[in-house]
UniProtKB/Swiss-Prot annotation:
Entry annotated with the keyword Cytoplasm: yes
Organism: Wigglesworthia glossinidia brevipalpis
Catalytic activity: L-threonylcarbamoyladenylate + adenosine(37) in tRNA = N(6)-L-threonylcarbamoyladenosine(37) in tRNA + AMP + H(+)
UniProt: Fe cation binding residues: H111, H115, D301
Record carries keyword Iron: yes
Lineage: Bacteria, Pseudomonadati, Pseudomonadota, Gammaproteobacteria, Enterobacterales
Gene Ontology cellular component terms for the protein in this record: cytoplasm
Co-factor binding details: Binds 1 Fe(2+) ion per subunit.
Protein name according to UniProt: tRNA N6-adenosine threonylcarbamoyltransferase
Gene3D superfamilies: 3.30.420.40
Gene this protein is translated from: tsaD
Protein's GO biological process: tRNA threonylcarbamoyladenosine modification
Chain positions recorded as substrate binding sites: I134, I135, S136, G137, A138, D167, G180, N273
Length: 340
């Protein structure tokens, strides 16, 4: 069974082909970072415009490069939410129109379920239940996964998501959007003992997150200098990243204790951060647990995860329960369960 996946939840246009027997055949992403960087963030109207421009050529390209005929596709999976309304509409309309033309089924996929299950593309599917942590530009959530389609959000972010916090602090340091990845690069040259950022919401019980205070702390710290040299930027970046890592580790310990889970899946754009990965590996090793990451190339938004989840749902033949066009606020908890 061959599934075409379409991803247009925000500003990345993605297309992929997944084979139930062979696995991921091909996936490609067209980024809009160079377009939005001049505005300091994603401009929804421009995202929609460039999705419309890019989607058809991208799909044509993956079929050409995979030597697979469009007629061989058995179904089309597309991101239906959460995300930007205009962006979602472009992908959903394209996918549904193509499916109608080919007379094959289309299925709406939850973007966060795609992220959550991305590690399964690389690894053998872990046994349920397991604990998942999604850390991206728009979401920071602990998810208890009891089955495919049966999820409970047990920890959430009360304000800025983790990836958003990285980008905002990077901007304060003069790094162009999206600056989170570049912040991590300069943090490697930073002195870990020069500055200290608070570890938000770690002195209180619970596994919710809050990162807006770190942005304020960084803003005040930057403002205390009349002029910041390059080393100071590196030192601030290091202190910020250390705070993030410590906070995530503390929260993961609590979440693992609460759920009694020995399995932790980490996904989303921020999960590509290597210092964070190292600390999470040490954490799970100390607990004799199992840790699963997404491949770094699949941490950010992509269609491979959408095609993969689509293949699971088509295999279960449970498409009617998810027959929505788009839902910009679609929660993981609102996904219908698929019976084994």
């Amino acid at each position: 069974m061959l599934i075409l996946g379409i991803e247009t939840s925000c500003d990345d246009t993605g297309a992929a082909i997944y084979d139930l027997e062979k696995g991921l055949i091909i996936h490609k992403v067209i980024s809009q970072n160079n377009i939005h960087s001049k505005y300091g963030g994603v401009v929804p109207e421009k995202s929609s415009k460039y999705h419309l421009k890019n989607i058809q050529p991208l799909v044509e390209n993956i079929f050409k490069n995979s030597n697979i005929s469009l007629s061989k596709i058995d179904g089309i999976a597309y991101t239906a939410g959460p995300g930007l309304v205009g962006s979602l509409i472009i992908g959903a309309t394209f996918a549904c129109s193509l499916a109608y033309t080919l007379q094959i089924p289309s299925i709406a996929i939850n973007h966060l379920e795609g992220h959550l299950l991305t590690p399964m593309i690389k690894y053998k599917r872990p046994k349920f239940p397991f604990l998942g942590l999604i850390i991206s530009g728009a979401h920071t959530q602990f998810v208890l996964a009891e089955d495919i389609g049966k999820y409970k959000i047990i920890g959430d972010c009360l304000d800025d998501a983790l990836g958003e916090a990285f980008d905002k602090v990077a901007k304060l340091l003069g790094i162009k959007y999206p600056g989170g990845k570049k912040l991590s690069i300069i943090a490697k040259q930073g002195n870990s003992k020069r500055f200290f950022f608070p570890r938000p919401m770690t002195k209180k019980p619970g596994i919710n997150f809050s990162f807006s205070g770190l942005k304020t702390y960084a803003k005040n710290l930057v403002s205390s200098f009349s002029k910041i040299d390059n080393q100071t930027k590196c030192d601030i970046a290091r202190a910020f990243e250390d705070s993030i890592i410590d906070t995530v580790i503390i929260k993961c310990k609590r979440a693992l204790d609460i759920t009694n889970s020995k399995i932790l899946l980490i996904s989303g754009g921020v999960s590509a951060n290597e210092p964070l990965r190292k600390n999470l590996r040490n954490l799970m090793k100390s607990r004799n647990g199992k840790l699963f990451f997404s491949k770094k190339s699949l941490c950010t938004d992509n269609a491979a995860m959408i095609a993969y989840v689509g293949s699971i749902r088509f295999k279960k033949n449970k498409t009617k329960d998810l027959s929505v066009l788009i839902n910009p606020k679609w929660s993981l908890e609102d996904i219908s369960r698929l019976e084994n």
